[in-house]
Amino acid sequence: MKRIAVLTSGGDAPGMNAAIRAVVRKAISEGMEVYGINRGYAGMVDGDIFPLGSKEVGDKISRGGTFLYSARYPEFAQLEGQLAGIEQLKKHGIEGVVVIGGDGSYHGAMRLTEHGFPAVGIPGTIDNDIAGTDYTIGFDTAVNTAVEAIDKLRDTSSSHGRTFVVEVMGRNAGDIALWAGIASGADQIIVPEEEFDIEKVASTIQYDFEHKGKNHHIIVLAEGVMSGEAFAQKLKEAGDKSDLRVTNLGHILRGGSPTARDRVIASWMGSHAVELLKDGKGGLAVGIHNEELVESPILGTAEEGALFSLTEEGKIIVNNPHKARLDFAALNRSLSQ
């Protein structure tokens, strides 16, 4: 394989640029040419494809976001979109593709491989919700950004004797909430993976104020549960009498210079993705498990270790969905006594 391409797709995540840099420089060291694709699969279909060299990725390792831009392009799920993208790949002499993104991005990589264009997926999302890896690129940075913000909110919360509900991203996964909540000393953490009793949450706030001598209370809420405003309304309906404020950290968690950990795992996975393509392997996703590099088939059976399977009706299902560490939820409860 002499010429490959790299793209980023879906939501941006700190560390994507580090992964792009690794793909480009590793490929060049192996005697391969690299092309960048702007705006993910949308750019592939539009032919927004251009050469990338070492100079183009210089000084990118410390930058957040993705300099290749990103976009969601549901049309690529259809055969017409796939064939249009493949036509552009052929036009530019591209033989393989590295795809950095989440589940939807992996589905595109799977389709490319089926059409004879080996594609390798790299997990890039702050949500840390992709099967086949313990950590995704961007997660560590997002957690650190959340902790910094919660630490600052604690200052104002304690100054005014208030309760703060801090909503964090994560889609349907509670990883950011759990890790940031523990690291910031949150009083309560609410995640989608665990049922909660709103009346117990309210009574815990009251008990902390009246019997523990606390003058403030921090609740970290994963967005997959409900919005912070809706949660606050339910708290009041459950009898909470505290001076309550809501802060949604929102997209700030996607930005910022990536942490050292995100830069390292992005570089590690990007380099390995190139090695796989060099060997002509596609339809695989790179990941980290027990601090070691792993690779999994994107499509296949659960017994084969594949991330996704197809039902008889042609529906894509996740074989081993990512699960947040609920032992961390128990840990935080024991530490917030």
Curated annotation (Swiss-Prot):
Binding positions (ATP): G11, R72, Y73, G102, D103, G104, S105
Cofactor(s) listed in the protein's UniProt record: Mg(2+)
EC number, UniProt record: 2.7.1.11
GO BP annotations listed: canonical glycolysis; fructose 1,6-bisphosphate metabolic process; fructose 6-phosphate metabolic process
GO terms assigned for molecular function: 6-phosphofructokinase activity; AMP binding; ATP binding; fructose-6-phosphate binding; identical protein binding; metal ion binding; monosaccharide binding
Activity regulation remarks: Allosterically activated by ADP and other diphosphonucleosides, and allosterically inhibited by phosphoenolpyruvate.
Binding residues for substrate: T125, I126, D127, R162, M169, G170, R171, E223, R245, H251, I252, L253, R254
Catalysed reactions, semicolon-separated: beta-D-fructose 6-phosphate + ATP = beta-D-fructose 1,6-bisphosphate + ADP + H(+)
Family: Belongs to the phosphofructokinase type A (PFKA) family. ATP-dependent PFK group I subfamily. Prokaryotic clade 'B1' sub-subfamily.
Subunit structure: Homotetramer.
Protein name: ATP-dependent 6-phosphofructokinase
Originating organism: Streptococcus pyogenes serotype M1
